[in-house]
């Protein structure tokens, strides 16, 4: 026998983000468009795009040009690289190959370098017209973890806590136990 959680007055949380917190009208239109595409096509690609577009800004990690180039190979060289975040420039990358990239935003220098190499910078509405089911598209995401996450969670020093304290220095005399006297 199972418990009827709703009857007991317990709150059952939804695991899926239903609506975006963004107030940007264009962003909301994109979500509306991809909701339509998810409903009309049986494409997992569109479901992924919709989920990532609906995620919070904190979870849209910027993707650098060097990471895009690093993930290129012979099979996906002609494909459209898709990212639901900002594409940023990387000055350590000396040459940029010809790319077709679709993203929410591009930094000014990243856009210049892609266009100078003979590539294209697409928006999501252009991608929906070009590939409504996501054929010939390669979905990329930046690494999710950030240095800031080290400090979140239980307070440092509490039992069971693995979070790092905010300290001005990490030397011998800072935030270290001096031992018993």
From Swiss-Prot:
It is found in: Cytoplasm. Its main location: cytoplasm. Belongs to the eukaryotic ribosomal protein eL18 family. Residues 169-181 have a biased composition (Basic and acidic residues). Residues 152-181 are annotated as: Disordered. GO terms for molecular function: RNA binding; structural constituent of ribosome. Pfam families: Ribosomal_L18. One of its GO terms (cellular component) is cytosolic large ribosomal subunit. This is Large ribosomal subunit protein eL18. The keyword Ribonucleoprotein applies. GO terms for biological process: translation. It comes from the Eukaryota. Keywords: Cytoplasm, Ribonucleoprotein, Ribosomal protein.
């Amino acid at each position: 026998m199972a418990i009827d959680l709703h009857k007991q007055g317990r709150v059952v949380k939804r695991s899926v983000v239903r609506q975006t917190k963004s107030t940007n009208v264009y962003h909301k239109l994109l979500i509306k468009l991809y909701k339509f595409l998810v409903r009309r096509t049986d494409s997992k690609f569109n479901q992924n795009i919709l989920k990532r577009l609906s995620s919070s800004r904190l979870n849209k990690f910027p993707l650098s040009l060097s990471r895009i180039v690093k993930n290129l190979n012979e099979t996906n060289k002609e494909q459209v690289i898709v990212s639901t975040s900002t594409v940023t420039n990387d000055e350590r990358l000396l040459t940029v190959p010809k790319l077709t990239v679709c993203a929410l935003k591009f930094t000014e220098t990243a856009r210049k370098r892609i266009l100078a190499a003979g590539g294209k910078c697409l928006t999501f509405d252009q991608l929906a017209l070009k590939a409504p089911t996501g054929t010939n598209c390669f979905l990329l995401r930046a690494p999710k973890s950030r240095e800031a996450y080290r400090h979140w969670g239980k307070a440092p020093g509490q039992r069971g806590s693995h979070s790092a304290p905010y300290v001005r220095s990490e030397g011998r005399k800072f935030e270290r136990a001096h031992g018993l006297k």
